[in-house]
């Protein structure tokens, strides 16, 4: 079927050919189920006794174009986010979902367990209505609130910022990397081989998924911070930072698990306004420690015979990107770089 795309912002509306989709759908994958002790009685149906609870699954929305490339793209979001990360941008342009669908890739968008449309948890949590959006504006390097960075690739109009704030969504249960990776791994079991695209907190879960499942043929990671895994005995010293989350440490895992990451190509991208040296500007220093750890991690991967590359976009002449590289004003250019990398690695057949 052909689907016309209407941008919500007329200023960014562009004339494109209709989006052609052969099939689309959605489903849940992974998760657990438990049964409350006791016996269920219809007369007392509001009591939990003897009843079941299904939860901790991921929610998947997928679209497949005609004559799709061999390997579909699986998109995993980061903290405080959902599959919306990869959909329409805050100012109404097409996101990676549509950009790569137009380029012939099947796309699978996840809401990880206990988030978004997968918001059915088997563990309890308290969700507080906390005013924190100016923190996130600063943490995600849009600027130092209320000021935008001068070269920022984020739209500076009020409506776009409101859309950005409204795409954030809470956990309904504690983040659990094992729960997340079990669900993502089961998705690959269901759909077969593919390429995992991750963002931020989702990148750590991405490494673990790639370890669990050899159907993950490659990993593209946008701005990972935590969750870098190193073989036992090779853990680097923590990297100190003035960032609000303190020093950044890696995670030690068995060598046999780490070596599974050396069997598939990996590329990591970081945006702009990241400090080169330690600084008191906490958001820039926070991401300095993440970038430094990523480089140590890639060095460890390559030392063991792997293929990991870290790309700091300003070093190749691309400036102004925020933490949300995939939805910035230059996201088509960013997609081009990812597409070129996939072609270079023989993954766009």
Model-predicted segments: where are they?
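Short beta-strand element of the alpha/beta-hydrolase
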Residues: 70-78
């Amino acid at each position: 079927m052909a689907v016309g795309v209407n941008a919500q912002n007329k200023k960014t509306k562009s004339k494109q050919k209709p989006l052609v989709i052969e099939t689309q759908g959605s489903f849940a994958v992974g998760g657990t189920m438990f049964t409350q002790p006791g016996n269920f009685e219809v007369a007392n149906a509001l009591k939990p006794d003897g009843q079941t609870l299904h939860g901790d699954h991921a929610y998947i929305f997928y679209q497949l174009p005609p004559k799709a490339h061999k390997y579909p793209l699986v998109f995993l979001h980061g903290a405080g986010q959902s599959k919306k990360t990869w959909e329409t941008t805050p100012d109404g342009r097409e996101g990676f979902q549509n950009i790569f669908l137009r380029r012939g890739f099947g796309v699978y968008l996840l809401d990880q367990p206990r988030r978004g449309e997968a918001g059915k948890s088997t563990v309890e949590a308290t969700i507080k209505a906390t005013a924190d959006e100016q923190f996130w504006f600063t943490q995600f390097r849009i600027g130092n609130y209320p000021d935008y960075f001068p070269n920022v690739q984020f739209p500076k109009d009020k409506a776009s910022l409101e859309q950005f704030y409204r795409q954030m969504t809470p956990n309904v249960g504690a983040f659990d990397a094992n729960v997340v990776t079990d669900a993502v791994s089961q998705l690959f079991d269901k759909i077969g081989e593919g390429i995992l695209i991750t963002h931020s907190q989702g990148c750590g879960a991405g490494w673990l998924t790639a370890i669990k499942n050899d159907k993950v043929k490659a990993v593209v990671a946008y701005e990972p911070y935590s969750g870098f895994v190193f073989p036992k005995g090779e853990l680097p010293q923590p990297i100190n930072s003035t960032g609000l989350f303190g020093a950044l440490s890696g995670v030690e895992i068995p060598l046999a698990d780490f070596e599974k990451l050396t069997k598939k190509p990996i590329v990591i991208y970081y945006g702009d306004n990241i400090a080169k040296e330690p600084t008191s500007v906490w958001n820039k220093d926070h991401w300095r420690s993440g970038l430094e750890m990523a480089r140590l991690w890639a060095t460890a991967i390559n030392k063991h015979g792997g293929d990991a590359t870290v790309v700091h976009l300003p070093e190749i002449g691309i400036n102004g990107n925020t933490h949300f590289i995939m939805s910035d004003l230059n996201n088509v250019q960013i997609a081009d770089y990812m597409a070129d990398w996939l072609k270079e690695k023989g993954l766009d057949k």
